[in-house]
Amino acid sequence: MTDLQTPPQDIIRGVRPAQRAVNATLQSDGVNLVLDAVSEEEETDLLALVDAGRWDCSLSRRVQHYGHRFAYSTKTCVPVAEPPPPAFTRLAERIRPVCWGADGGRDGDLQCTVNEYLPGQGISPHIDAHGAFGDGLVAVTLGAGCAIRLQRNRRHEAGAPIHTLWLPPRSALVLSGAARYVYTHGIVSRKGDLVDGEWRLRGRRVSLTFRRLPPPGPCACGFPESCDASGTAPKLLPTRLRGSAGGAEPPGCDAKKTVCASRVGVNIPGGPNKYKT
């Protein structure tokens, strides 16, 4: 088993160390990291609530959608029958001032996606579709921590630096302004992260991602060069759909279990055995 303090060099070679603090560049572009956004007790309750729900197993990892879900075929949000649970809306309201402002948002526009990341799973760098969601997104980390990769869209800014930020348990990552509309965000598919000079094996991480629907009318993001709604930029979406799934659950997947059988011992394409930055 890999030692946490002295991992083999062939594993960590090329892995970018994760920073604990948001640097000045990220801060000015709209990145904020709220530590201890939820208490340990609240984290336990939220995880129990999530695991009592029904998982969608049609993607490369398990997800749940509340309020609305993103439709990959039309690149828009469509309503779902189940609204966000009261515990989710209370959490979103608590975070509202730091992301959307005290008066931000409209009744019924809150969308929440629950993502489960098992060790070795990740998500490719992407920008949330401008036409589907408004400014400001919040990702609350439950369970294990993880490193996230942030970078300005290289299509318009060649050589833009890569920022790797450590998301500790119970933290809330806030992306607004340029960080939401111009930066790609993603999680490298690997089984550990380099933090404080130590190789930290990943555990099960559950992310609660809160977004709001955009106001009616054309996108007013203010970043036309990166706008996939009213501008010319292509949609930088995560490559996480199963090519032949057709929305069906993969064999061995039980939507009510904590871990799908189809996930155990499976090498996700480009995933568990890849340790690149």
Predicted regions and their residues:
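Non-heme Fe(II) oxygenase metal-center motifs and adjacent flexible, charged/small-residue loops
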Residues: M1-C260, G265, G270-T277
